[in-house]
């Protein structure tokens, strides 16, 4: 199967490298030519607890994203795994807009919300799947270290509005099977919206606070003052979800604390962005919570304050 990986960061290389090692043809698409050349020159090594996978330079197909459209028209891929951050979605849509009349199968791995509606408007004939994953990885120049074994769940975007056709279901199960064969715990879910809102809640609490205090995830729960602010953010989301008819598990607070424990040494993606001076996904995470509240004539004051605080931490000119 030909699989396109857009975004050659830690997760993109983890998924792409393992899919390549299990027999798929994988094409990596990077932001710049220099990034593609570096990947093609160095190859990549994937480090796991019990093995290392060495992807040699001559096995790597890497090109800048600007060449994706022409390449895809000549040799269509069967699936495209979109692994860029929310802040790069508009650039991706710009690059792929010439394919708006084609049918692409796209699995979207983004945090936060808002990107799927944008993509559906830009690519109305394509199949969009949400991918919710607890996989984590860290990258050095040519090495990716997998942070334990997570779960990946796939589901069609807006399945509660438009049911999947048999062909769409078959395509989604094919991708799930390929990911399983590559060593990922992947299943197809009919409750993907619930999983998305669960992850949004967790990210809206953990990400901004770790970025603000510059601490790993586990440090959030070692002081009662921090847990009180976590609970305030959590309660605001639950009120908004309840008004929106979104139901989560009764033990959601315990699940949130458990995530902090199980990822205790992890640096959240938002903290990593702040430390390196990159734009964050706060508008798509806490900003989305604020927008949900506004549509319901409710307020999310703590989320709104954190939204402005994190945006204010970004360097001038970075969005």
Locate the predicted segments by residue.
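Hydrophobic anchor at the start of a short beta-strand
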Residues: 3, 25-27, 106, 128, ...
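Rossmann-fold dinucleotide-binding core
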Residues: 109-195
């Amino acid at each position: 199967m030909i699989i396109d990986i857009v975004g050659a960061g830690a997760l993109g290389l983890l998924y792409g490298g393992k899919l390549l090692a299990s027999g798929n043809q994988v094409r990596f698409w990077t932001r710049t030519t220099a990034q593609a050349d570096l990947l093609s020159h160095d190859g990549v090594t994937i480090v796991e607890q019990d093995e290392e996978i060495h992807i040699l330079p001559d096995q790597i197909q890497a090109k800048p994203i600007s060449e994706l459209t022409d390449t895809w028209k000549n040799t269509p891929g069967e699936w495209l795994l979109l692994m860029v951050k929310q802040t790069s979605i508009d650039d991706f849509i710009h690059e792929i807009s010439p394919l708006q009349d084609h049918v692409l199968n796209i699995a979207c791995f983004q945090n936060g919300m808002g990107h799927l509606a944008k993509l559906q408007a830009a690519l109305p004939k394509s199949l969009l799947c949400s991918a919710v994953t607890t996989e984590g990885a860290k990258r050095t120049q040519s090495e990716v270290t997998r942070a334990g074994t997570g779960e990946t769940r796939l589901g069609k975007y807006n399945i509660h509005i438009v049911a999947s056709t048999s062909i769409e279901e078959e395509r989604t199960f094919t991708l799930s099977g390929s990911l399983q064969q590559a060593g990922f715990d992947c299943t197809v879910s009919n409750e993907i919206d619930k999983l998305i809102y669960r992850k949004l809640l967790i990210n809206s609490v953990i990400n901004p606070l770790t970025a603000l205090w510059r601490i790993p995830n586990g440090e959030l729960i070692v002081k009662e003052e921090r847990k009180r602010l976590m609970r305030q953010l959590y309660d605001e989301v639950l009120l908004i979800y309840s008004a929106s008819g979104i139901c989560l598990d009764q033990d959601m607070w315990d699940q949130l604390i458990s995530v902090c424990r199980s990822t205790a040494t992890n640096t959240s993606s938002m903290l990593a962005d702040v430390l390196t001076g990159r734009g964050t996904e706060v508008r798509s995470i806490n900003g989305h919570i604020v927008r949900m509240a506004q549509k319901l004539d409710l307020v999310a004051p703590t989320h709104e304050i954190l939204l402005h605080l994190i945006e204010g931490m970004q360097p001038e000119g970075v969005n």
